[in-house]
């Protein structure tokens, strides 16, 4: 018997999302206009809370859908205007170009990145050194590339290796289902569990590595570019200004990586079983024998393009998104990718998040029009200049650990810049606050998958169920990093940032502040 029209519509609404989630969103959409009529300020804060809720529930439904519905309603009922949304989008065009073109550009360099991580995995036998290598490699790559792409590459390596061993363990060849362990011999299951633990720890080290590297440069994370633009910094300026906080944090993060592996704390320390290593080595040897001269040329070309990418970013030869577009053109032209559909695949990872970021800007427009953060900013600005840095860092960190850090960073840098333009703070203090906002947004956000887009991408990937990486396990494994990164970042903001910035200014490394 066919279902009713009403039931069919309910099932279509937000698809496979739970009924309670659908009902919650409907309640939000119904009550918002009435609360806005009664008290616009309260309605604005309620909208922000609802939007953060959709980000926190990203595993139930991709936030673009519910967040987009809330944003559309906000424009319709007058919480902001379509014109203001357009202004916010136009002001942040560089960030949208970064997401569209840079992520797609790196897609065409995946062969090189896969080659690098495969060599690391099979060449280094010490688990501690291997973990450190993955963390450092992810940090370095994320300083110049998009963290999402770096994690996507490491996921590709892990899924590939897991599939190779799973096929051998199940003896089912190409018909093997990686999610089905029923055909695996009992003596293989123990080895498989150990292999899963090994991959889990490597993925977490790589994920944290993207955060450690991503906070250091203006292209490491999308919000970095927003903050850099607000402060008028180029690539070198941004790196130097962040370094009093980010360099000590990087060192302590790498020491944490070594410590948890050595002590086998928080689910770390599992080594690669020799049986698995033998299988993977055989597969890699066969792959290398099959590699043609044409394939080798592709790797060389991608390496040269990588050098161009780093050089262009460091010298600020063009806007970041346009450099990404040049990578797409060079990589496709010189490696023979000419089919439109093959090129189109490069954009599938970035465009949903680009659309979500546009929705972010709609909510930011509401925050500006309704003056939602005015009380918080006034509270912070009443404190001494020294205390302001700590408060901005902590407020950013708290929100970023439960919500998306791009959203949080955008809000706070806009408010800080408005305070400077209104004469509430000096240019010198604003630039210090920009560092506190950037580090506060990036470092504590490793606490949960909600804060870091790369972590959320890992959690929702095809790899997570294979290696038994759940939300709770991810939070638990991230805990030592969360504690160390947050506390070291706070101490550096509190004690090192202002004197180090002053010293660099006097040494002529930074432009003299007016």
Swiss-Prot record:
It is a multi-pass membrane protein. The chain crosses the membrane at residues 23-43, 63-83, 97-117, 120-140, 144-164, 202-222, 238-258, 303-323, 357-377, 391-411, 447-467, 475-495. It is found in: Cell inner membrane. It comes from Salmonella paratyphi A (strain AKU_12601). This is Na(+)/H(+) antiporter NhaB. The keyword Disulfide bond does not apply. GO terms for cellular component: plasma membrane. Belongs to the NhaB Na(+)/H(+) (TC 2.A.34) antiporter family. It catalyses: 2 Na(+)(in) + 3 H(+)(out) = 2 Na(+)(out) + 3 H(+)(in). Na(+)/H(+) antiporter that extrudes sodium in exchange for external protons. InterPro entries: Na+/H+_antiporter_NhaB (IPR004671). The keyword Transmembrane applies. HAMAP family: NhaB (MF_01599). Pfam families: NhaB (PF06450). Keywords: Antiport, Cell inner membrane, Cell membrane, Ion transport, Membrane, Sodium, Sodium transport, Transmembrane, Transmembrane helix, Transport. NCBIfam families: NhaB (TIGR00774), PRK09547.1 (NF007093). GO terms for molecular function: sodium:proton antiporter activity.
